[in-house]
């Protein structure tokens, strides 16, 4: 892996890595792997760049499927999505890629909006959701020299609010 490098690589290197991903996905399919899964993270917000334009997220979805992945886990890893943006995003994605088996949704419940984000995604047609027993989990790991370290900076929040959506809450909904 190349943690946190994506923001600093030039377009030539990006193109090389995309070709490499295409070759790897093809290799996996050719050797019996039936379902190759990718994650498109920071759809709605990025700890480094701030709010993400929805058009940019659509570009990543298109690119990921064009590489040959079978499913995307769409992720709000910053927990900043509002229900209206989630509904708009998934309505548009599912219009273009209507097979529900191609999509799942992962939310960090930083601001207590995870359940409303899941509800909005369900209303748009998403049927696979990533939940966590007891809300265990938190923010995306901060990596320094390949080692996870404690996060620092304005985008790290109160540890009491950084878990994932709890499975029992999701079932109750």
Model-derived segments and spans:
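Catalytic cores and adjacent flexible loops of soluble metabolic enzymes
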Residues: 1-173
């Amino acid at each position: 892996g190349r943690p946190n490098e994506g923001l600093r690589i030039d377009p030539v290197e990006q193109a090389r890595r995309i070709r490499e991903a295409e070759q790897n996905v093809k290799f996996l399919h050719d050797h019996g792997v039936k379902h190759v899964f990718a994650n498109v993270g920071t759809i709605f917000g990025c700890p480094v760049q701030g709010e993400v334009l929805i058009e940019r997220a659509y570009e990543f979805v298109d690119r990921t499927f064009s590489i040959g992945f079978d499913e995307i886990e769409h992720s709000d890893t910053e927990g900043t999505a509002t229900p209206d943006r989630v509904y708009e995003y998934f309505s548009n994605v599912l219009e273009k890629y209507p097979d529900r088996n191609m999509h799942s949704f992962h939310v960090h419940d930083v601001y207590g909006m995870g359940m409303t984000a899941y509800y909005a995604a369900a209303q748009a047609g998403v049927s696979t959701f990533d939940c966590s027993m007891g809300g265990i989990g938190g923010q995306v790991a901060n990596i320094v020299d390949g080692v996870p370290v404690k996060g620092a900076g304005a985008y790290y929040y109160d540890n009491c609010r950084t878990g994932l959506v709890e499975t029992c809450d999701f079932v109750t909904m």
